[in-house]
Amino acid sequence: MKYTLIAAIVVLALAQGTLAVEQSPELEKMAQFFEGMKTELMATVQKVSESLQSQTIIEDGRTQLEPIMTQIQEHLAPLATSVQEKVTPLAEDMQQKLKPYVDEFQSELESVLRKLLDQAKAITQ
């Protein structure tokens, strides 16, 4: 709002000044300078205005989405608990079934690494 008032005052001052004063090269340069400033100021005011409008829209959207998100969370909480209750025993069972294979793989990997280290020691000696 302040920027709009400032821009309006500058525009009125330029309009009044150009009508009241004779045109000379220096005044023409000053008029161009102020015209450029006016253009930049108007662009800045427009950007600020759009930014404020965007922020307002985002805040309104958040305000509208909060009740919906609360409802979704209320509906999903029992579902998440149910899924966790069903998945936990399955995961534990899978872990018990895979443990022997993992242990065997680990022991074989350790054996291969020992052989590689022994060979590396033999090569460096």
UniProtKB/Swiss-Prot annotation:
Coiled-coil segments on the chain, per record: none
UniProt-recorded name of the protein: Type-4 ice-structuring protein
Disulfide bonds: none
Functional note: Antifreeze proteins lower the blood freezing point.
Family: Belongs to the apolipoprotein A1/A4/E family.
Keywords: Antifreeze protein, Secreted, Signal
GO cellular component term, pick one: extracellular region
Signal peptide annotation: 1-20
Top-level taxonomic group: Eukaryota
Keyword Secreted assigned: yes
